[in-house]
Amino acid sequence: MIKQRTIKQSVQETGIGLHKGDKVTMTLRPAPANTGIVFRRVDLEPHADIPARAEAVGDTMLCTCITNADGVSISTVEHLASALAGLGIDNIIVEVDSDELPIMDGSASPFIFLLQSVGIEELNAPKQFIKIKKAIKVKDGDKWAELRPHDGFRVDFRIDFDHPAISQTRQHMVLDFDSSSYVDEVSRARTFGFMKDLEYMNANNLALGGSMANAVALDEYRVLNPEGLRYSDEFLKHKILDAIGDLYLGGHSIIGELVAYKTGHGLNNKLLNALLQNQACWEFVSYDNSEELPIRFASPILAN
């Protein structure tokens, strides 16, 4: 059978929180089968667990924030969730001593590195996938996102930014994860932002940790980062990275196709909730062997 996954051992990293700009220590710990993804606030006494659940997503203005039944929240979870989705990790405890995860370099790549550095372990329990049986779509003005049946996981994604530096890059792509590697194609794409917005947010005590060390910064005309872009279509690929993370807060990899136009955290979550609340549109499936499995994950990796 295709088995659930966790990590082989714990690993710790320190970084800056995007919103407060404070130092955050994060520890990733292995978890037993059927635990799911659980965020643990160790800065609180007693410690507070916040399970990743679609219905737990609250504020999505600048990032994805999830809240438990007691009202305890954790923010900026989408890049780690995206890395976990890309590596097919089902079970993990994420301890943080803050109300937000470290932003790292603004992509999923540092999380991929941490997870791979300790190795991925298979657990003796079947991995369950959410298989799309019937299309479901959500809209917000001219923005929309849809999940459709597909034997695999494919993303058909379009953005539309009227900005000189973005409009000259690719704004539409179809990525099939049967053949495309998440780690190579998507994980290194950084979040991006406009300097005028950052200045406004800083004045309102928001995004205090935001800098060119963890984002692609744009003025009215161009990219300001001296090193330029990591991918020629980094803006588009970061939006795909976000969507993969947002959809993984349902706790399971999706067998289906995401087709989206100008979607963001709020609409991604609206789509996931609409799906999970409409049982006619999906079912849980598991697979006996890798030949049947229509998604390609990295093989379980041994830590050095």
Curated annotation (Swiss-Prot):
Cofactor: Zn(2+)
Coiled-coil annotated residue ranges, if any: none
Documented EC number(s): 3.5.1.108
Organism: Pseudoalteromonas atlantica (strain T6c / ATCC BAA-1087)
Catalytic function, reaction form: a UDP-3-O-[(3R)-3-hydroxyacyl]-N-acetyl-alpha-D-glucosamine + H2O = a UDP-3-O-[(3R)-3-hydroxyacyl]-alpha-D-glucosamine + acetate
Identification of the protein by name: UDP-3-O-acyl-N-acetylglucosamine deacetylase
GO cellular component, one term: membrane
TM region(s), chain numbering: none
Active site feature: H265
A Pfam short name: LpxC
Keyword RNA-binding in record: no
GO BP, one annotated term: lipid A biosynthetic process
Record's keyword terms, sorted: Hydrolase, Lipid A biosynthesis, Lipid biosynthesis, Lipid metabolism, Metal-binding, Zinc
Metabolic or biological pathway, per its Swiss-Prot or TrEMBL entry: Glycolipid biosynthesis; lipid IV(A) biosynthesis; lipid IV(A) from (3R)-3-hydroxytetradecanoyl-[acyl-carrier-protein] and UDP-N-acetyl-alpha-D-glucosamine: step 2/6
InterPro entries reported for this sequence: Ribosomal_Su5_D2-typ_SF, UDP-acyl_GlcNac_deAcase, UDP-acyl_GlcNac_deAcase_C, UDP-acyl_N-AcGlcN_deAcase_N
